[in-house]
A protein has these predicted regions:
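Aromatic "clamp/platform" in nucleotide-sugar-dependent glycosyltransferases that forms part
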Residues: 309, 328
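Short hydrophobic beta-strand element within catalytic cores of glycosyltransferases
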Residues: 345-349
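Conserved acidic donor-binding segment of nucleotide-sugar-dependent glycosyltransferases
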Residues: 360-362, 366-373, 382-387, 402
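A conserved mid-protein helix/loop that constitutes part of the nucleotide-sugar donor-binding site
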Residues: 58-66, 246, 250-272, 279, ...
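N-terminal strand-loop element at the rim of the active site
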Residues: 28, 34-44, 50-57, 70, ...
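Donor nucleotide-sugar binding/catalytic pocket of nucleotide-sugar-dependent glycosyltransferases
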Residues: 177-180, 184, 199-237
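C-terminal alpha-helical cap of glycosyltransferases
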Residues: 406-440
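A short, well-ordered alpha-helix in the C-terminal region of glycosyltransferases
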Residues: 375, 382, 389-403, 415
Length: 440
Protein backbone atom coordinates (compact mmCIF):
# COMPACT_ATOMS: atom_id res chain seq x y z
CA UNK A 1 0.00 0.00 0.00
CA UNK A 2 1.46 3.40 -0.94
CA UNK A 3 1.63 6.37 1.42
CA UNK A 4 -1.32 8.36 -0.07
CA UNK A 5 -3.64 5.36 0.37
CA UNK A 6 -2.47 4.66 3.91
CA UNK A 7 -3.15 8.11 5.39
CA UNK A 8 -6.95 8.24 4.73
CA UNK A 9 -7.35 4.75 6.17
CA UNK A 10 -5.36 5.71 9.26
CA UNK A 11 -7.48 8.83 9.76
CA UNK A 12 -10.66 6.78 9.37
CA UNK A 13 -9.50 4.26 11.99
CA UNK A 14 -8.59 7.06 14.40
CA UNK A 15 -11.99 8.73 13.93
CA UNK A 16 -13.83 5.47 14.55
CA UNK A 17 -11.82 4.68 17.67
CA UNK A 18 -12.46 8.18 19.00
CA UNK A 19 -16.15 7.73 18.28
CA UNK A 20 -16.22 4.44 20.21
CA UNK A 21 -14.65 6.16 23.24
CA UNK A 22 -17.15 9.03 23.08
CA UNK A 23 -20.04 6.58 22.65
CA UNK A 24 -19.05 4.65 25.77
CA UNK A 25 -18.79 7.90 27.72
CA UNK A 26 -22.26 8.98 26.54
CA UNK A 27 -23.80 5.63 27.47
CA UNK A 28 -22.20 5.77 30.92
CA UNK A 29 -23.59 9.27 31.46
CA UNK A 30 -27.08 8.14 30.43
CA UNK A 31 -27.16 5.06 32.69
CA UNK A 32 -29.51 6.69 35.26
CA UNK A 33 -32.25 6.61 32.62
CA UNK A 34 -32.43 2.83 33.13
CA UNK A 35 -33.35 3.25 36.79
CA UNK A 36 -36.68 4.94 36.15
CA UNK A 37 -39.92 3.51 37.46
CA UNK A 38 -42.04 1.48 35.09
CA UNK A 39 -45.70 0.86 36.03
CA UNK A 40 -47.08 -2.70 36.13
CA UNK A 41 -48.53 -3.96 32.82
CA UNK A 42 -52.23 -3.69 32.14
CA UNK A 43 -54.50 -6.24 30.49
CA UNK A 44 -53.07 -5.49 27.04
CA UNK A 45 -49.32 -5.10 26.85
CA UNK A 46 -48.00 -1.83 25.47
CA UNK A 47 -45.45 -2.88 22.86
CA UNK A 48 -43.11 -0.29 21.37
CA UNK A 49 -41.40 -1.19 18.10
CA UNK A 50 -38.25 0.73 17.11
CA UNK A 51 -37.75 1.05 13.36
CA UNK A 52 -35.09 2.95 11.42
CA UNK A 53 -37.36 4.66 8.87
CA UNK A 54 -41.01 3.64 8.63
CA UNK A 55 -41.24 5.46 5.29
CA UNK A 56 -38.27 3.61 3.78
CA UNK A 57 -38.17 0.80 1.23
CA UNK A 58 -35.99 -1.93 2.75
CA UNK A 59 -36.93 -5.53 3.41
CA UNK A 60 -36.64 -5.12 7.19
CA UNK A 61 -39.07 -2.21 7.11
CA UNK A 62 -41.58 -4.19 5.08
CA UNK A 63 -41.43 -7.29 7.30
CA UNK A 64 -41.76 -5.28 10.52
CA UNK A 65 -44.75 -3.28 9.24
CA UNK A 66 -46.38 -6.50 8.00
CA UNK A 67 -45.91 -8.13 11.40
CA UNK A 68 -47.31 -5.23 13.42
CA UNK A 69 -50.76 -5.62 11.84
CA UNK A 70 -51.65 -9.00 13.41
CA UNK A 71 -50.03 -8.00 16.72
CA UNK A 72 -52.57 -5.20 17.20
CA UNK A 73 -55.26 -7.81 17.92
CA UNK A 74 -53.67 -8.80 21.21
CA UNK A 75 -51.43 -5.87 22.15
CA UNK A 76 -51.26 -2.08 21.96
CA UNK A 77 -48.64 -1.48 19.28
CA UNK A 78 -46.69 1.76 18.95
CA UNK A 79 -44.20 2.04 16.08
CA UNK A 80 -41.44 4.57 16.74
CA UNK A 81 -39.55 5.46 13.58
CA UNK A 82 -36.11 6.89 14.35
CA UNK A 83 -36.38 8.98 11.20
CA UNK A 84 -39.06 10.26 8.91
CA UNK A 85 -36.84 10.09 5.87
CA UNK A 86 -39.52 10.48 3.18
CA UNK A 87 -42.73 12.54 3.13
CA UNK A 88 -44.96 9.50 2.51
CA UNK A 89 -44.61 5.82 3.41
CA UNK A 90 -43.57 3.44 0.66
CA UNK A 91 -45.33 0.49 2.31
CA UNK A 92 -48.80 0.69 3.91
CA UNK A 93 -48.68 1.46 7.63
CA UNK A 94 -50.56 -1.12 9.73
CA UNK A 95 -54.07 -0.16 10.76
CA UNK A 96 -54.54 -0.12 14.53
CA UNK A 97 -50.91 0.72 15.31
CA UNK A 98 -49.82 4.16 16.49
CA UNK A 99 -46.91 5.56 14.47
CA UNK A 100 -44.64 8.32 15.77
CA UNK A 101 -41.43 9.80 14.36
CA UNK A 102 -38.50 10.59 16.63
CA UNK A 103 -36.71 12.83 14.14
CA UNK A 104 -39.08 14.21 11.51
CA UNK A 105 -36.77 15.51 8.79
CA UNK A 106 -39.66 17.40 7.16
CA UNK A 107 -40.82 19.31 10.26
CA UNK A 108 -39.59 22.86 10.96
CA UNK A 109 -36.45 22.83 13.11
CA UNK A 110 -35.46 25.21 15.88
CA UNK A 111 -31.97 26.56 16.40
CA UNK A 112 -30.95 23.76 18.78
CA UNK A 113 -32.16 21.05 16.41
CA UNK A 114 -30.31 22.60 13.47
CA UNK A 115 -27.12 22.92 15.51
CA UNK A 116 -27.16 19.35 16.87
CA UNK A 117 -28.13 18.03 13.44
CA UNK A 118 -24.70 19.06 12.15
CA UNK A 119 -22.89 16.65 14.47
CA UNK A 120 -22.70 12.87 14.05
CA UNK A 121 -24.57 10.54 16.37
CA UNK A 122 -22.88 9.44 19.59
CA UNK A 123 -25.28 6.58 20.31
CA UNK A 124 -25.06 4.80 16.94
CA UNK A 125 -21.84 2.84 16.27
CA UNK A 126 -19.83 4.32 13.41
CA UNK A 127 -19.48 0.83 11.90
CA UNK A 128 -23.27 0.41 11.57
CA UNK A 129 -24.67 1.25 8.12
CA UNK A 130 -27.34 3.57 9.55
CA UNK A 131 -24.71 5.82 11.17
CA UNK A 132 -24.52 8.15 8.16
CA UNK A 133 -28.23 8.94 8.47
CA UNK A 134 -28.16 9.76 12.18
CA UNK A 135 -27.09 12.87 14.06
CA UNK A 136 -26.70 14.13 17.61
CA UNK A 137 -30.21 15.57 17.28
CA UNK A 138 -31.50 12.11 16.33
CA UNK A 139 -29.92 10.80 19.56
CA UNK A 140 -31.86 13.36 21.58
CA UNK A 141 -35.09 12.52 19.74
CA UNK A 142 -34.62 8.77 20.27
CA UNK A 143 -34.01 9.23 23.99
CA UNK A 144 -37.21 11.27 24.22
CA UNK A 145 -39.13 8.57 22.37
CA UNK A 146 -37.76 5.82 24.61
CA UNK A 147 -38.44 7.57 27.89
CA UNK A 148 -41.37 9.94 27.47
CA UNK A 149 -43.91 7.21 28.32
CA UNK A 150 -43.25 3.71 29.69
CA UNK A 151 -43.95 0.54 27.75
CA UNK A 152 -44.10 -3.13 28.74
CA UNK A 153 -42.12 -4.56 25.82
CA UNK A 154 -39.63 -2.85 23.52
CA UNK A 155 -38.76 -4.49 20.18
CA UNK A 156 -35.76 -3.12 18.28
CA UNK A 157 -35.26 -4.16 14.68
CA UNK A 158 -31.67 -3.43 13.59
CA UNK A 159 -28.29 -3.59 15.40
CA UNK A 160 -28.00 0.14 16.14
CA UNK A 161 -31.47 0.22 17.70
CA UNK A 162 -31.01 -3.11 19.48
CA UNK A 163 -27.84 -1.76 21.10
CA UNK A 164 -29.75 1.33 22.18
CA UNK A 165 -32.58 -0.77 23.62
CA UNK A 166 -30.20 -3.08 25.47
CA UNK A 167 -28.16 -0.27 26.97
CA UNK A 168 -30.73 2.42 27.80
CA UNK A 169 -34.19 0.86 28.21
CA UNK A 170 -35.63 1.38 31.73
CA UNK A 171 -35.42 -1.67 33.96
CA UNK A 172 -38.70 -3.52 34.16
CA UNK A 173 -39.28 -3.22 30.42
CA UNK A 174 -38.75 -6.45 28.49
CA UNK A 175 -36.42 -5.94 25.53
CA UNK A 176 -36.52 -8.00 22.33
CA UNK A 177 -33.82 -7.67 19.72
CA UNK A 178 -34.98 -8.68 16.24
CA UNK A 179 -31.76 -9.33 14.33
CA UNK A 180 -32.33 -9.77 10.60
CA UNK A 181 -28.75 -10.78 9.82
CA UNK A 182 -26.20 -12.82 11.79
CA UNK A 183 -23.29 -12.11 14.11
CA UNK A 184 -20.76 -13.16 11.45
CA UNK A 185 -22.08 -10.57 9.00
CA UNK A 186 -20.95 -7.60 11.13
CA UNK A 187 -17.52 -5.97 11.10
CA UNK A 188 -15.32 -7.00 14.06
CA UNK A 189 -15.65 -3.68 15.98
CA UNK A 190 -19.45 -3.78 15.67
CA UNK A 191 -19.49 -7.50 16.44
CA UNK A 192 -17.73 -6.87 19.77
CA UNK A 193 -20.26 -4.20 20.72
CA UNK A 194 -23.13 -6.51 19.74
CA UNK A 195 -21.86 -9.37 21.90
CA UNK A 196 -21.31 -7.05 24.86
CA UNK A 197 -24.72 -5.35 24.67
CA UNK A 198 -26.98 -8.20 23.53
CA UNK A 199 -26.28 -9.95 26.84
CA UNK A 200 -28.64 -7.43 28.46
CA UNK A 201 -31.61 -8.31 26.25
CA UNK A 202 -34.54 -10.34 27.48
CA UNK A 203 -35.03 -12.11 24.14
CA UNK A 204 -33.04 -12.18 20.91
CA UNK A 205 -35.02 -13.23 17.84
CA UNK A 206 -33.15 -14.40 14.74
CA UNK A 207 -34.28 -15.64 11.33
CA UNK A 208 -32.15 -18.70 10.64
CA UNK A 209 -30.75 -21.73 12.44
CA UNK A 210 -27.09 -20.82 11.70
CA UNK A 211 -27.67 -17.31 13.08
CA UNK A 212 -29.17 -18.82 16.23
CA UNK A 213 -26.22 -21.18 16.66
CA UNK A 214 -23.76 -18.31 16.26
CA UNK A 215 -25.46 -16.19 18.90
CA UNK A 216 -25.90 -19.11 21.30
CA UNK A 217 -22.13 -19.65 21.21
CA UNK A 218 -21.29 -15.95 21.57
CA UNK A 219 -23.85 -15.25 24.34
CA UNK A 220 -23.39 -18.50 26.27
CA UNK A 221 -24.00 -18.02 29.98
CA UNK A 222 -25.75 -14.66 29.58
CA UNK A 223 -29.27 -16.00 30.14
CA UNK A 224 -30.64 -14.26 27.04
CA UNK A 225 -33.43 -16.30 25.48
CA UNK A 226 -32.63 -16.85 21.80
CA UNK A 227 -35.50 -17.82 19.50
CA UNK A 228 -35.74 -18.42 15.77
CA UNK A 229 -38.82 -16.94 14.10
CA UNK A 230 -38.61 -16.48 10.31
CA UNK A 231 -40.00 -13.55 8.39
CA UNK A 232 -43.66 -13.67 7.42
CA UNK A 233 -45.21 -13.16 4.01
CA UNK A 234 -48.47 -11.20 3.81
CA UNK A 235 -51.33 -12.41 1.61
CA UNK A 236 -50.18 -11.92 -1.97
CA UNK A 237 -52.42 -9.88 -4.27
CA UNK A 238 -53.66 -11.22 -7.56
CA UNK A 239 -53.07 -14.57 -9.15
CA UNK A 240 -49.73 -16.38 -9.13
CA UNK A 241 -47.53 -16.60 -12.18
CA UNK A 242 -48.44 -19.10 -14.90
CA UNK A 243 -44.76 -19.11 -15.91
CA UNK A 244 -45.60 -18.33 -19.54
CA UNK A 245 -43.65 -15.07 -19.96
CA UNK A 246 -40.03 -15.19 -21.08
CA UNK A 247 -38.81 -13.08 -18.19
CA UNK A 248 -36.20 -13.73 -15.50
CA UNK A 249 -36.78 -11.40 -12.56
CA UNK A 250 -34.45 -10.05 -9.85
CA UNK A 251 -34.99 -7.26 -7.32
CA UNK A 252 -33.06 -5.45 -4.62
CA UNK A 253 -30.89 -2.45 -3.86
CA UNK A 254 -28.20 -1.88 -6.47
CA UNK A 255 -25.30 -2.41 -4.06
CA UNK A 256 -22.28 -4.72 -4.10
CA UNK A 257 -23.73 -7.31 -1.72
CA UNK A 258 -26.66 -8.06 -4.05
CA UNK A 259 -24.27 -9.43 -6.67
CA UNK A 260 -26.07 -8.06 -9.72
CA UNK A 261 -22.70 -7.78 -11.47
CA UNK A 262 -22.36 -11.56 -11.16
CA UNK A 263 -25.93 -12.06 -12.35
CA UNK A 264 -25.41 -9.90 -15.45
CA UNK A 265 -22.27 -11.85 -16.35
CA UNK A 266 -24.09 -15.14 -15.76
CA UNK A 267 -26.92 -14.04 -18.05
CA UNK A 268 -24.68 -13.09 -20.98
CA UNK A 269 -24.54 -16.66 -22.45
CA UNK A 270 -28.30 -17.05 -21.87
CA UNK A 271 -29.00 -13.93 -23.94
CA UNK A 272 -27.18 -15.47 -26.91
CA UNK A 273 -28.82 -18.88 -26.57
CA UNK A 274 -32.38 -17.70 -25.83
CA UNK A 275 -32.87 -14.31 -27.55
CA UNK A 276 -36.56 -14.17 -26.65
CA UNK A 277 -35.86 -14.02 -22.91
CA UNK A 278 -35.22 -10.85 -20.87
CA UNK A 279 -33.61 -10.29 -17.47
CA UNK A 280 -35.32 -7.51 -15.50
CA UNK A 281 -33.66 -6.12 -12.38
CA UNK A 282 -35.84 -3.92 -10.17
CA UNK A 283 -34.32 -1.55 -7.62
CA UNK A 284 -32.13 1.51 -7.31
CA UNK A 285 -28.83 2.28 -5.68
CA UNK A 286 -25.30 3.59 -5.95
CA UNK A 287 -24.17 0.95 -8.45
CA UNK A 288 -26.73 1.70 -11.14
CA UNK A 289 -24.28 3.48 -13.47
CA UNK A 290 -21.64 0.79 -12.99
CA UNK A 291 -24.16 -1.96 -13.77
CA UNK A 292 -25.44 -0.06 -16.81
CA UNK A 293 -21.86 0.20 -18.08
CA UNK A 294 -21.39 -3.55 -17.59
CA UNK A 295 -24.59 -4.26 -19.55
CA UNK A 296 -23.32 -2.11 -22.42
CA UNK A 297 -19.84 -3.66 -22.27
CA UNK A 298 -21.27 -7.18 -22.58
CA UNK A 299 -23.61 -6.19 -25.42
CA UNK A 300 -26.73 -6.87 -23.36
CA UNK A 301 -28.58 -3.61 -23.98
CA UNK A 302 -32.26 -4.46 -24.42
CA UNK A 303 -31.69 -7.96 -23.06
CA UNK A 304 -30.97 -6.94 -19.45
CA UNK A 305 -33.10 -4.12 -18.07
CA UNK A 306 -32.44 -1.99 -14.99
CA UNK A 307 -36.08 -1.20 -14.31
CA UNK A 308 -35.81 0.97 -11.17
CA UNK A 309 -38.23 0.89 -8.27
CA UNK A 310 -41.69 -0.58 -8.61
CA UNK A 311 -44.60 -0.48 -6.20
CA UNK A 312 -46.04 -3.54 -7.90
CA UNK A 313 -43.32 -6.15 -7.53
CA UNK A 314 -45.96 -8.86 -7.10
CA UNK A 315 -47.47 -7.86 -10.43
CA UNK A 316 -44.04 -8.09 -12.03
CA UNK A 317 -43.60 -11.54 -10.48
CA UNK A 318 -46.90 -12.62 -12.03
CA UNK A 319 -45.46 -11.58 -15.41
CA UNK A 320 -42.21 -13.54 -14.93
CA UNK A 321 -41.29 -17.22 -15.07
CA UNK A 322 -38.11 -17.42 -12.96
CA UNK A 323 -36.79 -15.48 -9.99
CA UNK A 324 -33.04 -15.25 -9.37
CA UNK A 325 -31.12 -14.12 -6.27
CA UNK A 326 -27.40 -13.44 -6.69
CA UNK A 327 -26.52 -12.01 -3.26
CA UNK A 328 -23.17 -12.65 -1.67
CA UNK A 329 -24.80 -12.71 1.79
CA UNK A 330 -28.41 -12.53 3.02
CA UNK A 331 -30.44 -12.82 6.21
CA UNK A 332 -33.80 -14.31 5.28
CA UNK A 333 -34.80 -12.49 2.10
CA UNK A 334 -38.52 -11.76 2.00
CA UNK A 335 -38.35 -11.51 -1.76
CA UNK A 336 -37.61 -15.26 -2.04
CA UNK A 337 -40.64 -16.11 0.10
CA UNK A 338 -42.83 -13.82 -2.00
CA UNK A 339 -41.49 -15.16 -5.29
CA UNK A 340 -42.17 -18.71 -4.13
CA UNK A 341 -45.65 -17.67 -3.02
CA UNK A 342 -46.24 -16.29 -6.52
CA UNK A 343 -45.34 -19.68 -8.00
CA UNK A 344 -41.89 -18.81 -9.32
CA UNK A 345 -39.04 -21.31 -9.17
CA UNK A 346 -36.10 -19.54 -7.53
CA UNK A 347 -32.46 -19.87 -8.55
CA UNK A 348 -30.17 -18.62 -5.80
CA UNK A 349 -26.60 -18.61 -4.65
CA UNK A 350 -26.19 -20.89 -1.64
CA UNK A 351 -25.07 -17.88 0.39
CA UNK A 352 -25.20 -17.52 4.17
CA UNK A 353 -27.68 -17.73 5.67
CA UNK A 354 -31.27 -17.48 4.44
CA UNK A 355 -31.52 -19.03 0.96
CA UNK A 356 -30.45 -22.56 2.02
CA UNK A 357 -33.18 -22.52 4.69
CA UNK A 358 -35.87 -21.36 2.28
CA UNK A 359 -35.02 -23.44 -0.80
CA UNK A 360 -34.74 -27.21 -1.04
CA UNK A 361 -32.53 -27.83 -4.06
CA UNK A 362 -34.35 -29.68 -6.83
CA UNK A 363 -37.63 -29.63 -4.88
CA UNK A 364 -38.86 -26.03 -4.96
CA UNK A 365 -35.87 -24.21 -6.47
CA UNK A 366 -32.21 -24.49 -7.38
CA UNK A 367 -29.15 -23.58 -5.29
CA UNK A 368 -25.68 -23.01 -6.75
CA UNK A 369 -22.35 -22.26 -5.03
CA UNK A 370 -22.00 -18.63 -3.96
CA UNK A 371 -20.17 -16.54 -6.52
CA UNK A 372 -20.03 -19.32 -9.15
CA UNK A 373 -21.10 -17.48 -12.30
CA UNK A 374 -20.91 -20.57 -14.52
CA UNK A 375 -23.11 -22.58 -12.14
CA UNK A 376 -25.65 -19.75 -12.07
CA UNK A 377 -25.69 -19.72 -15.88
CA UNK A 378 -26.22 -23.49 -15.96
CA UNK A 379 -29.14 -23.35 -13.49
CA UNK A 380 -30.88 -20.58 -15.42
CA UNK A 381 -30.28 -22.42 -18.69
CA UNK A 382 -31.84 -25.58 -17.23
CA UNK A 383 -35.03 -23.82 -16.15
CA UNK A 384 -35.39 -21.81 -19.36
CA UNK A 385 -35.00 -24.91 -21.51
CA UNK A 386 -37.40 -27.10 -19.50
CA UNK A 387 -40.94 -25.67 -18.99
CA UNK A 388 -41.99 -28.86 -17.19
CA UNK A 389 -39.26 -28.38 -14.59
CA UNK A 390 -40.27 -24.74 -14.15
CA UNK A 391 -43.86 -25.77 -13.50
CA UNK A 392 -42.96 -28.55 -11.08
CA UNK A 393 -40.60 -26.41 -9.00
CA UNK A 394 -42.94 -23.41 -9.16
CA UNK A 395 -45.97 -25.31 -7.87
CA UNK A 396 -43.96 -26.85 -5.05
CA UNK A 397 -42.56 -23.41 -4.22
CA UNK A 398 -46.12 -22.16 -3.64
CA UNK A 399 -46.74 -24.99 -1.20
CA UNK A 400 -43.43 -24.37 0.60
CA UNK A 401 -44.22 -20.66 1.02
CA UNK A 402 -47.31 -21.44 3.13
CA UNK A 403 -45.04 -22.15 6.12
CA UNK A 404 -44.32 -18.39 6.23
CA UNK A 405 -47.95 -17.28 6.29
CA UNK A 406 -48.39 -13.97 8.15
CA UNK A 407 -51.15 -15.28 10.41
CA UNK A 408 -48.99 -18.22 11.52
CA UNK A 409 -45.84 -16.17 12.15
CA UNK A 410 -47.86 -13.36 13.75
CA UNK A 411 -49.38 -15.81 16.23
CA UNK A 412 -45.90 -17.02 17.20
CA UNK A 413 -44.80 -13.45 17.89
CA UNK A 414 -47.94 -12.70 19.88
CA UNK A 415 -47.34 -15.74 22.10
CA UNK A 416 -43.72 -14.71 22.61
CA UNK A 417 -44.74 -11.22 23.70
CA UNK A 418 -47.53 -12.48 25.97
CA UNK A 419 -45.06 -14.82 27.64
CA UNK A 420 -43.10 -11.77 28.82
CA UNK A 421 -46.00 -10.57 30.98
CA UNK A 422 -44.43 -11.83 34.23
CA UNK A 423 -41.25 -9.85 33.52
CA UNK A 424 -39.29 -8.93 36.66
CA UNK A 425 -41.14 -7.11 39.44
CA UNK A 426 -40.27 -3.45 39.24
CA UNK A 427 -37.75 -1.99 41.64
CA UNK A 428 -39.22 1.26 42.96
CA UNK A 429 -36.13 2.22 44.98
CA UNK A 430 -34.62 4.09 42.08
CA UNK A 431 -31.57 1.82 42.21
CA UNK A 432 -30.55 -0.66 39.54
CA UNK A 433 -31.89 -4.13 40.27
CA UNK A 434 -30.01 -7.35 39.74
CA UNK A 435 -30.52 -9.07 36.42
CA UNK A 436 -33.36 -11.60 36.36
CA UNK A 437 -33.86 -13.97 33.50
CA UNK A 438 -36.90 -15.49 31.91
CA UNK A 439 -36.71 -19.24 31.36
CA UNK A 440 -36.16 -20.28 27.76
Amino acid sequence: MNEPDRKPRLRRRVRRRAHRVLRRAALWTLRPLRWRRVPPPGERLHVRVLLQNAHGTGGTIRTVLNLCGPLTRDHDIEIVSALKGNPKPFFPLPAGAAVTYADDRFAPKGRTARLLGRFPSLLIPAEESSFRYMSLWTDVCLLRALHRTPCDVLIATRPSLILLAAELTPRGTATIGQDHMSLESYQPPLRRQVVRAYRRLTVLSVLTAPARAGYEAALAGSGVRIVRIPNASPPLPGRPSRREHEVVLAAGRLVANKGFDLLIRAYAPIAAEHPGWTLRIFGSGLRRERLAALIAELGLTGRVELSGFTRDLHGEMARASIYVLSSRREGMPMVIIEAMGMGLPVVSFDCPFGPPELITHGHDGLLVPTGDVDALTAALRELIADPGLRDRLGEQARRSARAYDLEHIGARWSRLISGLRPFPPHDFTGKPEKSRRIPA
